[in-house]
Amino acid sequence: MPNNKPNLLFVFADQLRASSVGYAGEEAVRTPNLDAFARTGTIYKNAVSMLPVCGPFRGSLITGRTPTSTGLVINDIPLRTDEISIGHCFKDAGYDTAYIGKWHLDGPNRPAPVPPGPRRQGFDYWMGANFEHNYDRSQFTDNAGHLQMWEGWDAQAQTSHTIEYLK
């Protein structure tokens, strides 16, 4: 029986204001792929972050809960492994799940690997970095739990890995 479930892709960007993209009228920044998403997807024109700091906001995106509910009120607090994440929900619905890119939900262990298991919050496939601001050949943890280096500019390497995973 064929699998008719659509692929779902969530893009979490650091430091991205709603006004800093081409489809919002920003001429100095070229964002053709985001502009294409905007033409065919949904644009939320009135969105508010409960806590616009990396870790707490990522925790909200992953769990659907507020930072005060998850306890992630500042950076470098680990997301509790008993939290229900989108990784768990999609996995329970029969999806293969993957997380590729910056995680920042495993506490202050910035360069340390995020090992396979509950700290990956239900994601089956993993190529993530708990925290990194190097952006060029920075470290990440591979699916087996080993530290690796992205090849070249992180965003491009992560995008390439995501495309390969989706194929």
What are these regions (language model features)?
Residues M1-K167:
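Formylglycine-dependent sulfatase
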